Amino acid sequence: MAGHSKWANIKHRKAAQDAKRGKIFSKLIRELTVASRQGGGEVADNPRLRAAIDKALANNMTKDTIQRAIERGAGNTDGDEMEETVYEGYGPEGVAVLVECMTDNRNRTVSDVRHAFSKNGGNLGTSGSVAFMFHKQGRLTLPEGVSEETAMEATLAAEPEDIVTQADGTLEVVTSPERFGAVKDALLEADIEPVASDVGLYPDNYTSIDDVETARKVLKLFDMLEDLDDVQNVYSNADFSDAVMAELE
């Protein structure tokens, strides 16, 4: 079981930007609220909520804040109704982009998202134009030094989908969304604490970006979308070469 993860550089970049802008907490609270509203407040029965809690704790959110968000979503406290929506489009060079949003005003959100696409050489597509290119998975990045054999022994009973080797030699465990929590628990029981983990949308195939100017245009689109208050996550099939990433840093 071997492969290559091409999205790690963008995930890490996005996390750093969100933290820098101070927006990560508001996005995490919304995810906790909606996850508990849709699947209930019991973590054992709600893989999405488990993933949201893990991400909130990793970003140093207090347990009290997490619990309040869960209670709000589960209906124990009053709060504004948030609606989930996904927008699909294409960026420069035909890069496929999925934008996950939570909003209390669809008209405002679609207008903002459309503006970001049009201002950066892209266009907002129709429903289904891009989504078929992506699939939902859980991914857990393991610490350096963990062997594939050790990872397999630790997680086999939890039924991961795959274990892939990333460009830097570290391992990434791939799971279905439903098995994400079980696989993470199995790793922790084996004293293997993932350095990063999430459930997200990943492309079936990638569009290679090999020149710096195109990369800048694509990343500018990502930045503008991520700056929008209603946007939770931005996913893309862009694959930036190591040479391009080095020039951009």
Swiss-Prot record:
GO biological process: regulation of DNA-templated transcription
UniProt cross-references to SUPFAM superfamilies, sorted A to Z: YebC-like
Keywords from the named record: Cytoplasm, DNA-binding, Transcription, Transcription regulation
Gene3D superfamilies: 1.10.10.200, 3.30.70.980
Gene Ontology molecular function: any one: DNA binding
Record has Mitochondrion as a keyword: no
GO CC aspect terms: cytosol
Keyword flag Disulfide bond: no
PANTHER family tied to this protein: TRANSCRIPTIONAL REGULATORY PROTEIN YEBC-RELATED, TRANSLATIONAL ACTIVATOR OF CYTOCHROME C OXIDASE 1
Family, similarity comment: Belongs to the TACO1 family.
Protein name: Probable transcriptional regulatory protein Csal_1845
